[in-house]
Amino acid sequence: MIAMRIYQVIISFEVLSELEAMAKYIASIYRPESGHNYVNRVLGQLAALSYSADAYQHSRFALAKAIHPKAKTISIINHKWTVVFHIDGDFVIVDKIIPSKSMH
């Protein structure tokens, strides 16, 4: 049996600020709870990196590599967002969330 590595996920302050702005924007268009629900979905997918981070290869995108030389990427929320993260020891560090269309 292969032991699965579990990481602690750390979200950068920049990403937290982006998520807060995202929640406020969605709440201004729809309902306040819509913004919170959306961000909670994002946070749930980020939390899943604690056990899935090793499954992703280093990114081939120049934008991701510019953020961190050992960046990995994952698409979330119906491929609308790309999460740029890297692994450092026992930690998965979420560096940035970018609209997926800007990655290509």
Describe every region a protein language model picked out.
Residues I2, I74-H104:
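Enriched for short, Lys/Arg-rich terminal
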Residues I26-S28, V39, L43, A66, ...:
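General N-terminal targeting signals
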